[in-house]
């Protein structure tokens, strides 16, 4: 149907519809749509139908919205308004490629429409179609050459395309149009100058950049950044004398910034240790309160000189009471000689302070206050905790608590020691004690919640967080709204350890949604940053968004999701009623009655929990509806509800795992775990070339990784078991695997691996697993290798020992309950406080308790 021109009355109504849409008065907009469409002459008016659909979409009525917009487009396919509206609808559904097509169709009908061009440019930068973005910004510059956003947008397009010369020409052309007096400081002009300078530095125009920053120095607001840029450029240009003066000035401004000292050392080209120490001594005299010029020499000096400097450093900090002292010195603990000196000094202080209130019994003068001994004991607790001497650490922290039972740091440290020991319940208990001393401290509250989650106390952790969340909603929901990802990743791990895979997957998908929302939130900044001239921050934002899923929170969530989906593929959840029938066949009447009673109680409990959750959901939906009705804000449509029961019973777990894997392969390719997770997925899918790709990439990162060793042997064994592979695939596999195995059979390859890593328990465990995998008759030898605890083993830490004990229980070595018990007792003697090695409670009634107990401590893998 051709475009129908509306008469003046209806035309005014249509303008009011547009105004209502812009002002978010959607109900009024629908009234005006109805007034036009109720007239039989204009009942099929395409543009009005399209606007009605767009308005309905803003009210959350998505299906009706599409129906009206498509109808409007069919009725007036030559209208740029209809195509534009259809593009806006697609954009609201995150179908950006489709939206771009709609905008392009609209521009064919009205090539100079500013609003469509602006909307198109937003989508192009969002999708990183930089070539298309440059063309669109050029059109906008031609149409609106007086608008600053036109120039800036066009320049940014060239900058992102790394055409620095053109970007600088455009920025300079625009800068010359700005009427800013030389002595006036204008923030937006200052940002423009700094952005211009950033482009110059990225183009390696160092001399021009230095001249530029010096020319406009008076008009730049951020004076500190100017000095830092000067120092960086002068160093690169080799103008070392000038650079040294700049870095000295920077140190005068902030004597605690380690980077300034590094720059000063480079500028002065100091070759000897004495010269370096002299520089630090001079700075220390100029800035007597600064810690850094006294701390950095401790990294440089050895032996007796270190003892002398460390003695002075420790005494000053203990006397004034410096809680983060150990954190300041922790980076020195790679050097065993320095650790011994620190230990000797501080233990002597403690002994002397106890007897005579001096650091040394040979001193005179003013006595140290009682708090000095407290901080010395606090330091020693941290020191011995770092060295893995947990009994001593506990002795010192208990002594400190006995003298000052109101200091939060002491209870915090005690909880930390128990965490490192592997007793997570006790750690949570002491962190709760610390939290109770100051309930208004959000940091300690969060730490307490985190420790509770590590101990699988999910409900208690939620209650702890509820002290700082909005009233009227559950803490879990509120933390999700706030994108509190540390809490969610810890919840994922806790649910995973408890076998509540549906709940864990729900949290994984929530984290995935957060990252999607963060990416989507860029839209607000594409126009805002150009308007406010925060161009450096804007370019940094775009670059951050490009690698957003490299973040540790995403990696943790994705890794857990993949592991759970692999587990669900290997052991699909069975129908409970069928499972009960199978179990009941072999039970006596008494046992059957007991089992049925237990099941009824469990069902009743589950039903009550489900009813509570349902009531909570209904209440939240009512609140959301009320909020929408009151505010009449634009709604993006309700998200699909994440139901744990559905998530853990997906039809194809491997396909779901691949969805989480793809961002990791694109952005975290330097992490070996990415490729080993990929191998595990492709191994189950039977994709041999993709398996090969994964192990090759992992091999290039770390050829001696224990998990990779297991994957290589399983892969090679699987290839040899599949004789029906296509010839070309077999040829490629044999050629590539030959490079790794170097003409060795699997047994020899495994033996070499064990010999090479005879002092590493993690490697011995993987080698022993593969020994049993290749030859079941060698069970005893494999277990003997995995359970070695002699003095030559270097990594006898809690994490690794628990890993071995779990391997003895999970079937990696077949049935070996007696060997597990022997190993548990040996580990208990080695680590008496670790929960995983304590004698299992009520073993007769529950033989699997040990497995469940040790499984709770997987969390230590990333903590110790």
From Swiss-Prot:
One of the protein's GO biological processes: positive regulation of DNA-templated transcription
Domain of life: Eukaryota
Record-linked SUPFAM superfamilies: TPR-like (SSF48452)
Ranges for the TPR repeats: 46-79, 80-113, 148-184, 224-257, 374-407, 409-441, 485-518
Residue span of region Disordered: 603-638
One annotated GO molecular function: ribosome binding
Cellular-component GO terms for this entry: cytoplasm; cytosol; extracellular exosome; NatA complex; nucleus; transcription regulator complex
Biased amino acid composition, Basic and acidic residues: 606-621
Keywords noted in UniProt: Repeat, TPR repeat
Keyword Repeat: yes
Keyword Repeat: yes
Gene3D superfamilies reported in the protein's UniProt record: 1.25.40.1010, 1.25.40.1040
Function: Auxillary subunit of the N-terminal acetyltransferase A (NatA) complex which displays alpha (N-terminal) acetyltransferase activity.
Subunit structure: Component of the N-terminal acetyltransferase A (NatA) complex composed of NAA10 and NAA16.
The protein's name: N-alpha-acetyltransferase 16, NatA auxiliary subunit
